[in-house]
Amino acid sequence: MEAAAAVVAAEAEVENEDGDSSCGDVCFMDKGLQSISELSLDSTLHAVNLHCNNISKIEAIDHIWNLQHLDLSSNQISRIEGLNTLTKLCTLNLSCNLITKVEGLEELINLTRLNVSYNHIDDLSGLIPLHGIKHKLRYIDLHSNRIDSIHHLLQCMVGLHFLTNLILEKDGDDNPVCRLPGYRAVILQTLPQLRILDCKNIFGEPVNLTEINSSQLQCLEGLLDNLVSSDSPLNISEDEIIDRMPVITAPIDELVPLEQFASTPSDAVLTSFMSVCQSSEPEKNNHENDLQNEIKLQKLDDQILQLLNETSNSIDNVLEKDPRPKRDTDITSESDYGNRKECNRKVPRRSKIPYDAKTIQTIKHHNKNYNSFVSCNRKMKPPYLKELYVSSSLANCPMLQESEKPKTEIIKVDQSHSEDNTYQSLVEQLDQEREKRWRAEQAENKLMDYIDELHKHANEKEDIHSLALLTTDRLKEIIFRERNSKGQLEVMVHKLQNEIKKLTVELMKAKDQQEDHLKHLRTLEKTLEKMERQKRQQQAAQIRLIQEVELKASAADREIYLLRTSLHREREQAQQLHQLLALKEQEHRKELETREFFTDADFQDALAKEIAKEEKKHEQMIKEYQEKIDVLSQQYMDLENEFRIALTVEARRFQDVKDGFENVATELAKSKHALIWAQRKENESSSLIKDLTCMVKEQKTKLAEVSKLKQETAANLQNQINTLEILIEDDKQKSIQIELLKHEKVQLISELAAKESLIFGLRTERKVWGHELAQQGSSLAQNRGKLEAQIESLSRENECLRKTNESDSDALRIKCKIIDDQTETIRKLKDCLQEKDEHIKRLQEKITEIEKCTQEQLDEKSSQLDEVLEKLERHNERKEKLKQQLKGKEVELEEIRKAYSTLNRKWHDKGELLCHLETQVKEVKEKFENKEKKLKAERDKSIELQKNAMEKLHSMDDAFKRQVDAIVEAHQAEIAQLANEKQKCIDSANLKVHQIEKEMRELLEETCKNKKTMEAKIKQLAFALNEIQQDM
C-alpha cells in the first residue's frame, strides 16, 4: 500500500509540473458494499468501478468534480440521482439494477455513453432535457427493459442530435417495442442521426462492437510502428542537439531559404495523423473486452519503455564516440551571459517521442489553445514548429556538413601560431557576429509584427468558420424540418385517401343500417301496438281494482265506526267500574272501622274457612266457563266451514263475470288501436317529407363550407412550397460560401506554418551564435547533468503526453467525421434538390388537375352522405325515445303489479265484503248487456273505417318504396364510378412512388461506390505518406 501511495504521489507531482489535472482509478468490484458513503473517495479521481455490490442509492459522489467514468452495474439501485455536480462525466454504466425511470441526467453535459440495460425501465422522459447541441450523448444501451410505446421512445430520442448508436435488442434480450411491425424502419426514419441500431448499421449489416472498442488500441499500435521505423536520431531532445552542435556559425546567406520551409505543407502532417489515428469511438460493453484492452495497453506501454531505453542508450553511445574538445574561450560580456541564461530557461522540456507522434500532439495542442497562443505569442511559441525546423535542419540543411569542415580545420590547426594571431581572429569574428546579431534582431522584430497581424487575420477567419458551422447546423435543422413536413404531408395524403375509402364503406354501411332501422321501426311499431293493448287492458283492470278497493274502503269505514262505538261503550263501562270500586272501598273502610279486632288464632280460622269457600266457587266458575268455550268453538268452526263454501261459490261467479268483461274490453281496444295506428301513419308520412326537405337545405350549406376550406388548404400548401424553394436556394448559396471559406482557411494555415518556421530558424541561429561565444568545458559538464535530470522528467512526461494524445486524437477523429458527413450531405442535398424541384413541379400540375376532379366528386358525395347521416341521426333519436318510453312503461307495469298483489292480499283478508257485492253484480250485468249492444254497433263501424284506411296506407307505402329504390340505384351507380376513378388515381400514384424509389436506390448505390473509391484513394495516400516518412 505504501508503495502504491508513493507511485500515486509521484504521478501527481509530475502532472502538476506539466500543468495537467490529477487523475486516478479506483476499483471495488464484488466487495459487498451496502452504500458508497462507506468509502472515502478522493476528489481527484477520474474513474470509479463499483461493479457487483449491494448499493441501493447513489450518494457521496458530489465532491468528485473530475470524475469521467462511473460503473455502478449489478447493484440494487432503483433511482438515478446525486449526479448533478459531475459535469465532466463521460461514461455511465447502470446495467443490472432495479431502475424504472430514466432521470437526473440534466447536468451531465459531457456524457457520451449511457448503459441502462437489464433494468425495469418503461419511462424515458429523463432524456428530454438532454435535447439540443449542449449535450453530446452518442451511445445508449437499453436492451432487456420494459419499453412498450414507440411514440414515447421517439419523443424522447428525437432531440439527441449526436446520438449515433442505440441498442434496444441484443443477444435475444429485447423490449416490447421491438416486437412491433416496422419498428426498425420507423426509428431509422425519425432518427436520421443514427448510424447503428441494435448492433446493425443502416443497411441491416451486423456490426462487431469489439472492433470498435479496439480501434483506440490500433491508434497506439500505429504510433509504435512509427517509433520503430524511425531510424534517424530524432529521439534526442532539442537541448542535446543544440549543445552537441559545433560552435561554428554559418553566414545568413547560407541559411535555408523560406521557400524550402513553405514547401512543407501542414496537410501532409494532418494526412499522416489521419492515417495513424483512424476514427474510433470507445465502447465498453463486456468485462472480457475491457480486460483484453487493458492487457494490450500494458504491452504497448512496455514496448514504449523499451524504445525509450534504447534511445537513451544510443544517446550515451553517441556521447562516448564523439567527444567534443573544450573551447578555450571566455565569457565576453555580461549581456551575452544573460542571454544564454534566458535561452536556457525558456527552452521547453522535450520528450523522446518520435517526430510523427509529437507533431500530431503539438498540432492538436495548437488547435485547442489557439486563443491563448495569440495572447502570449512573444513569451512562448508552439513547440511543434521548433521540432519541424530542427528536423528539417538535421535532414535537409547542409549546415552540419559545413560546420564539420571548420571543426576539422580547427582540430588540425598547428599549435605553433602565436597568441596574437588567435586574439585578432577572435576579435574579428566577434565584430562580425555582433553585426549579424543586430541584423537578425531587426528582422526578428519585423517578423514579430507581421506574425501579430497574421494571428489577427487567423482569429477573424476562425470566427467566420464558427459562423459557417452554425449556419450548417441551422441548415441541417431546416432540412430536417422540411423532411418532417414532407413526411407529414404524405401522411396527410394517405389519411385523406383512407378517409375517402372509409367514407365509401360507411355509406354502404349506412344504407344497410337504414334498411335495418326501417325493419327495426316496423318491429317497434308492432311492439308499440301490443304495448298499447296491454296498457288498455291494465287500465281496465286498474279501474276494476279501484272499484273493489273503494268498496273495501267503505266496508273498512263501517268497521271503524262500529269499533269506535264499541270503544265508547267500553269506556263508559270502565268509568262505571271505577265508581263501583270507589264505593266498595268506602264501604270496606267503614266495615274495618266498625269491626272488632280478633286474636290471631280466631282470625286464622275465619280466613281458612272463607278461603275454602272461595276456592269452591272459583272451581265451579272455571268449569262453567270451560263448557261455554267448547260450545262457542264448535259454533265458530261450523261458521268457518259455511263461510268457506260461500266464498268458493262467489269466487266462481265473479271469475265468470270477469272473463266476459275482459273479452269485450280486448275487442274494443283492438278496434281503437287500429284507428289510432292509421292516423299516426298519415302524420308520420307528412313529417318525413318535411324532414327530408330540411335535410337537403342543410347539406347544401355544409357542402359550400367544405369546398371553401379545401380551397384555403390548397392555397396554404402552395405558399409553403414557395417558401421551401426560397430556403433551398439560400442553402445552395451558403454551401458555396462555406467551400470558398475552407479553401481560404487552408491557404492561410500553410502561409502561417511557413512564416513561423522561418522565425524559428532565425531564433535557432541566434542560440547557436550565443553558444559559440559562451561555451566552455565547465558549462558542458553542467549541461550534461541537467540533461540527464531532464531525461528522467521527460520519461514521466511521456506517459502524460500519451494520455493527452489519445484524448486529442479522439477529438480530431470526431471533427473529421463531422466535416466528412457535412460535405457528403451537402453534395447529396444539392443533387436531391435539383431532382426534387423538377419532380415537385410535375406533381403540382398533376395535383391541381386531380384536386379539381376530386373536389367536384367529393362535393356530390358529401351532400349525399350528409343527407343519409341526418336521416340516420333522426332514426336513432326516435329509437332512443321509443326505448325510453318502453322503460317507463315497464316501470309502470311493475308498480301496477305490486299494487295488484297488495290489493289481492287485502281482498283475501276482507272476504266478508263479497256478500254486499252480489247485489251490485246483478246491476252491473244489466248495464253490461246494454253496453255490449252499443259496442257491437261501434265495432262494425270501426271495421269499415279500418279497411278504408288500410287501402290508403298500402297505396302510400308502394309510392314511397318506389321513390326510395330509384334514389338508392342512382347513389350506387355514382359510387361505383367514383371508386373506379379513385382506383386509377391510386395506381398512377403508386407507379410514381416506385419510380422515385428506384431512382433513390440508384443514387445510394452510386454514392456507396464513390465512397469506396475515396476510401481506397485515402488508403493509398496514407500508405505513400508512411513510406515517405520512413524514407525521411
UniProtKB/Swiss-Prot annotation:
Coiled-coil blocks: 421-647
Comp. bias intervals (Basic and acidic residues): 318-330
Entries under InterPro entries matching the protein: Leu-rich_rpt, Leu-rich_rpt_4, LRR_dom_sf
Location relative to the cell: Cytoplasm, Cytoskeleton, Microtubule organizing center, Centrosome, Centriole
Broad class of where this protein is predominantly found: cytoplasm
SUPFAM superfamilies documented for this protein: L domain-like
Domain LRRCT: 175-218
UniProtKB keywords: Cell cycle, Cell division, Coiled coil, Cytoplasm, Cytoskeleton, Leucine-rich repeat, Mitosis, Repeat
LRR repeat residues: 44-65, 66-87, 88-109, 110-131, 136-157
GO cellular component, as recorded: centriole; centrosome; cytoplasm
Known role: Required for the organization of the mitotic spindle. Maintains the structural integrity of centrosomes during mitosis.
Name of the protein in its database record: Leucine-rich repeat and coiled-coil domain-containing protein 1
Organism encoding this protein: Homo sapiens
Higher taxonomy: Eukaryota, Metazoa, Chordata, Craniata, Vertebrata
